[in-house]
Amino acid sequence: MSAVKTLEAVARDRVGKGAARAVRRQGQIPAVIYGGGQPPQSIAVDLIRTRTLIYAGGFKTTLFEINAGGKKVRAIPRDFQLDPVTGVPLHVDFLRVVSGQTVTVEVPVHFVNEDAAPGIKKLGGTLNIVAHTLSLEVAPDQIPDAIEVDLTGRAIGDVIHVSDIKIPAGTYTGEATDPVANIVPPTVLGAEVEAEEAAIAEAQSAEAAEEKAEESAEDEKKDGEEA
């Protein structure tokens, strides 16, 4: 399970675009804590610390203890905004966590023991991943870091469903029959790549022929005008 992480914050009295810009100029990020049957609380968190947490991965599945003005609040990130050009965080939304509450989160899927899968190791098959994350409804303090899928003994043609996986905590929000991955023969993906490359080459050839035809028509037009 993910450990609870601490995050220092300061309370914000002013809100709005102007106030948010002022916060960012001070090296902080405007944020809000909402939910739990309480009014939203506007805060500011350190830019460098928050950016590091976001880009380290697993940010939205981490439970935080936020210390704002001496008052500690447990919350989980629900959303964040990044500058489309620089990638710098612009705003973070935190959901306040209360006793007995569950949240829905996307937990990453990690595949292990690929070398112990005969279909991959011996026969050259390829692991085709269908779901990189699984949606779980789980208590905030029980969110797993990842869901492991053991590939030991897997052969070509095997399909791994959610029902084949041990969910460490919480409940999967989809169907037990949902596929997570399958092992395909080496020729399958190769054929798909070849078909895609052939389609691209055909499209490029057609485009080149069209451009050449347009150039020829333009040359004929010029010759006619000169005559």
UniProtKB/Swiss-Prot annotation:
A single Gene Ontology CC term: cytosolic large ribosomal subunit
Compositionally biased region (Basic and acidic residues): 209-227
Region (Disordered): 199-227
Cited SUPFAM superfamilies: Ribosomal protein L25-like
Keywords: Ribonucleoprotein, Ribosomal protein, RNA-binding, rRNA-binding
GO MF, one annotated term: 5S rRNA binding
Domain of life: Bacteria
Gene Ontology terms describing biological process: translation
CDD domains associated with the record: Ribosomal_L25_TL5_CTC (cd00495)
Transferase is among the record's keywords: no
PANTHER family referenced in this protein's UniProt entry, alphabetically: RIBOSOMAL PROTEIN L25/GLN-TRNA SYNTHETASE, ANTI-CODON-BINDING DOMAIN-CONTAINING PROTEIN, RIBOSOMAL PROTEIN L25_GLN-TRNA SYNTHETASE, ANTI-CODON-BINDING DOMAIN-CONTAINING PROTEIN
The protein's role, per its UniProt record: This is one of the proteins that binds to the 5S RNA in the ribosome where it forms part of the central protuberance.
Subunit field text: Part of the 50S ribosomal subunit; part of the 5S rRNA/L5/L18/L25 subcomplex. Contacts the 5S rRNA. Binds to the 5S rRNA independently of L5 and L18.
The protein's name: Large ribosomal subunit protein bL25
Organism: Methylobacterium radiotolerans (strain ATCC 27329 / DSM 1819 / JCM 2831 / NBRC 15690 / NCIMB 10815 / 0-1)
